[in-house]
Amino acid sequence: SALEAIEEMGYPVVLKPVVGSWGRLIAKVTDRAGAEAILEHKEYLGAYYHSIFYIQEYVEKPGRDIRAFVIGGETVGAVYRSSEHWITNTAKGAKTSKCELSSELNEICQKAGNAIGNGVLAIDLMESKNGFLVNEINYTVEFRNSIEPTGVNIPGKIIDYVISEAR
């Protein structure tokens, strides 16, 4: 059961819908009572999509995560998404700033993109005590608040890529 998996992973954990965006319906669970309450809500909300979710290890991060943009196998830019809240999504108020692409970050993004066949991707990473961790690979790319800090015309790069693939 989900409760057993949570107990096995250890607290805190993050419960996250399989389909979702903008940091919605994500819960940080810090103890068994919280887990039981959230799981009960999911069970009785009734909609099928509430019954399928990820259980992720909670990762301590420095008040930010990284969103990198990979288009056609090329990492074109990245931003930090910073927030005082543990959810570092711009739709939830996080602020963006430029993230320099180190060779390590670029290599991880390349490998993540290659693992799923590339295309147009937004790869969300976290900085942990063990290095970079890939949290999500998004094929529906949200680049709001990312064009200015990166200095990259992300929609233009997407259009160029799509045209080149169509030829």
Task: Please state what every model-predicted region is.
Residues 24-116:
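Phosphate-binding site of ATP-dependent enzymes
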Residues 20, 83, 140:
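Short, solvent-exposed loop/turn segments at secondary-structure junctions
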Residues 8, 41-44, 164:
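Residues within well-ordered alpha-helical secondary structure of globular protein domains
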Residues 20, 73, 128-131:
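Short strand-connecting beta-turns/loops that link adjacent beta-strands
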